[in-house]
């Protein structure tokens, strides 16, 4: 439990995916962003499941304050809403990793970007907690030539030697 685990390496962009449903947690998002900033990759915040959240505008405003200089996009991976804006990050030879808690919709987003069902997905439980359907990291080549790395959902994230993001 006390050991440090490397989440991803050699990536250009990290999509930090947070569900706008019951998964939304601003403090956890701050921890993700601190880790991203410390790691040196370009961070992009994706607020997913916009179709399930009537409070999306308020949560977007809160997230923009926390994200500071990082871009924030509201999307619905399941319905395809807002996903087209991600093409600017998915350029040829760019490696993009997805980070977020279980149930945030990372694998659904992978399927949407790839244009086909490559990753198994499940409905989120009634309490909005994920089911850990993705259990290992997996790489995919996108139609535009980017490398997309899907990662298992994280139950928790703690900061280790992160100075810049605090």
Tell me what each language-model feature is.
Residues 102, 107-108, 112:
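Walker A/P-loop
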Residues 29-33, 58-60:
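Charged helix-capping and loop-helix junction motifs
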Residues 42, 49-104:
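Canonical P-loop GTPase G-domain recognition
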Residues 1-14, 18-20, 25-27, 34-43, ...:
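Helix-rich effector regions associated with P-loop NTPase G domains
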């Amino acid at each position: 439990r006390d050991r440090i685990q490397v989440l991803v390496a050699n990536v250009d962009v990290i999509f930090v995916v947070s569900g706008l449903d019951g998964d939304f947690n601003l403090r956890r998002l701050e921890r993700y962003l601190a880790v991203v900033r410390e790691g040196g990759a370009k961070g992009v915040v994706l607020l997913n499941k916009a179709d399930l959240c009537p409070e999306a505008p308020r949560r977007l405003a809160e997230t923009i304050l926390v994200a500071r200089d990082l871009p924030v996009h509201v999307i619905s991976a399941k319905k395809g809403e807002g996903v087209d804006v991600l093409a600017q990050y998915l350029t040829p030879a760019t490696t993009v990793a997805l980070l977020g808690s279980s149930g945030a919709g990372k694998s659904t987003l992978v399927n949407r970007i790839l244009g086909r069902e490559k990753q198994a997905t499940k409905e989120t439980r009634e309490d909005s907690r994920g089911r850990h359907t993705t259990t290992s990291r997996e790489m995919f080549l996108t139609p535009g030539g980017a490398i997309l790395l899907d990662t298992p959902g994280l139950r928790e994230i703690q900061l280790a030697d992160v100075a810049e993001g605090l």
